[in-house]
């Protein structure tokens, strides 16, 4: 029997990749599992530059977004901005997810809420990885906050690369296939897994499987982790073709 799901996305206003990669993964899945279909519904929070100040101001708009998406009776809500959550201190994703879920319930459209920040932590743990190496587009101080957040979750970051791109639109214009070369400068010798993009706005999907095959290590991203958590929350098989180990259907 056919099943249809509405995916609600809470998106920074300048983010162009969340609404590209997440639908791409689930549409790719639909080709192989046609009886499970998805539509995508977004609400935006204002943000142009990836600074701690703008991110905190943007996060205040997430409540409105959750209520708007619950008006559409979405089956699950995904909060796209990893660094907006992580720059507010360890464990903030749990507070944010609980608050937003409560707002959807108060609005009569109760839905589970996941965040890319929480999803990445869960994705790393699901793979059984204790140590990771990562690539992020952020300026180094923000990358350091991401590393601190991940470390506080009990995961060691053995190496990182910061691309230092402050303009969020420019982050979204990056060629994902460049990551195949960039990752060669990442020390993965002590890592159990590699986070190819610790940012939902930095495109990486076309490179995930290629880099995983190249390194012989599990490779994930903020976006693949978000899709994994979306599928888990809907009690669906966690399978997307050619999207790395996390979405192989094994976990």
Swiss-Prot record:
One of its GO terms (biological process) is protein homotetramerization. The keyword Hydrolase does not apply. Belongs to the maleate isomerase family. This is Maleate isomerase. Homodimer. It is an enzyme of class 5 (isomerase). InterPro entries: Iso_Racemase_Enz_sf (IPR053714), MaiA/AMDase (IPR026286), Maleate_isomerase (IPR028615). It catalyses: maleate = fumarate. Reaction is initiated by nucleophilic attack of cysteine at the double bond, yielding a covalent succinylcysteine-like intermediate. One of its GO terms (molecular function) is maleate isomerase activity. Pfam families: Amdase. The modification S-(2-succinyl)cysteine is found at residue 81. The lineage of its organism: Bacteria, Bacillati, Bacillota, Bacilli, Bacillales. The active site is at 81 (nucleophile), 199 (proton donor). Catalyzes cis-trans isomerization of the C2-C3 double bond in maleate to yield fumarate. Its EC number is 5.2.1.1. The keyword Metal-binding does not apply. Substrate binds at residues 15, 81-83, 138, 168, 200-201. Keywords: Isomerase.
